[in-house]
């Protein structure tokens, strides 16, 4: 759902490339005229679930960092669920992903899960003190307890 209008600059003269912009979906900055192709390109990016999970792990944190920097309100479980449900609704029904059958509905579900992962990561980034700091403190408390009880000798 809603991938048919995804205009991406694909072809340009290499010597006209000035650089790139964006962190999630990078776009070239180049000198030259732009034209739109009349035919769609076949975009076979979703090879298997494992590759999709690796790709999601890479880009969801980038999106979460950018979103966390721009957000003013705290992420709640309700917000996470609402974002996932609405993403599925948009992809599957509003943008008619259901017309692609099971693959379209699965893709809508994957996009909804990714949206929730982004907001879960924003939630993690909003935690003060950080989860890593809290866990380090708990681990130290356990080590201290074990030392006192004579279970470890560090």
Q: What do these predicted regions represent?
A:
Residues 130-154:
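Alpha-helical transmembrane segments and their immediate juxtamembrane flanks
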């Amino acid at each position: 759902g809603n991938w048919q209008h995804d205009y991406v600059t694909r072809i340009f003269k290499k010597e006209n490339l000035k650089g790139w912009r964006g962190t999630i979906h990078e776009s070239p900055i180049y000198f030259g005229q732009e034209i739109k192709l009349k035919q769609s390109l076949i975009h076979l990016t979703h090879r298997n679930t494992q590759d999709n999970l690796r790709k999601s792990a890479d880009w969801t944190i980038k999106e979460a960092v950018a979103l966390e920097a721009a957000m003013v309100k705290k992420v709640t479980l309700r917000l996470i669920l609402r974002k996932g449900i609405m993403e599925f609704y948009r992809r599957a029904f509003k943008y008619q992903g259901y017309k692609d059958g099971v693959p379209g509905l699965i893709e809508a579900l994957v996009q909804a899960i990714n949206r929730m992962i982004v907001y879960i990561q924003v939630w993690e980034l909003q935690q003060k003190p950080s989860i890593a700091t809290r866990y380090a403190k708990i681990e130290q408390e356990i080590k201290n307890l074990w030392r006192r009880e004579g279970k470890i000798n560090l």
